Amino acid sequence: MDNFISHIYAVENSTTIPSSNSYSLIFMLLVFLSIFYFMIFRPQRKKIQEHDRLIKSLSYGDEVFTSSGFVGKIVKITKTGYIVLELNNNVEVFVKSDFIVSIFPKGTLKNMKSM
């Protein structure tokens, strides 16, 4: 029993906690944050800015594509952020301007209808 207790004391005294360098931890954190910034935040911000420019450039008569799959011509742009799209003759829908994905070149709808 005495041998067992002395063995436990020897094991306790022989284990040392390695001291870690706090600078390496900070460096790794900065590396991960910079990778996260350049891989996620920056591209997302560019995408949002590009979409905002698209929304601001909308005008009457533009042919647009929405995220819900509608293709139509802008009939009216309201001040509240909604757009009235003409999908077909006498078929109009209200769409939130944030859901406009792209603007087609003029005459695209005529080409699509003739197909």
Curated annotation (Swiss-Prot):
Quaternary context: Part of the SecDF-YidC-YajC translocase complex. The SecDF-YidC-YajC translocase forms a supercomplex with SecYEG, called the holo-translocon (HTL).
Pfam families cross-referenced by the UniProt entry: YajC
Function, as annotated: The SecYEG-SecDF-YajC-YidC holo-translocon (HTL) protein secretase/insertase is a supercomplex required for protein secretion, insertion of proteins into membranes, and assembly of membrane protein complexes. While the SecYEG complex is essential for assembly of a number of proteins and complexes, the SecDF-YajC-YidC subcomplex facilitates these functions.
Keywords (A to Z) from UniProt: Cell inner membrane, Cell membrane, Membrane, Protein transport, Translocation, Transmembrane, Transmembrane helix, Transport
Name used for this protein in its record: Sec translocon accessory complex subunit YajC
Localization terms from the record: Cell inner membrane
A Gene Ontology term for the protein's cellular component: plasma membrane
GO biological process, one term: protein transport
Organism listed in the record: Buchnera aphidicola subsp. Baizongia pistaciae (strain Bp)
The keyword Methyltransferase is annotated on this UniProt entry: no
Family: Belongs to the YajC family.
Residue stretches spanning the membrane: 22-41
Cystine connections: none
Domain of life: Bacteria
Membrane-topology descriptor: Single-pass membrane protein
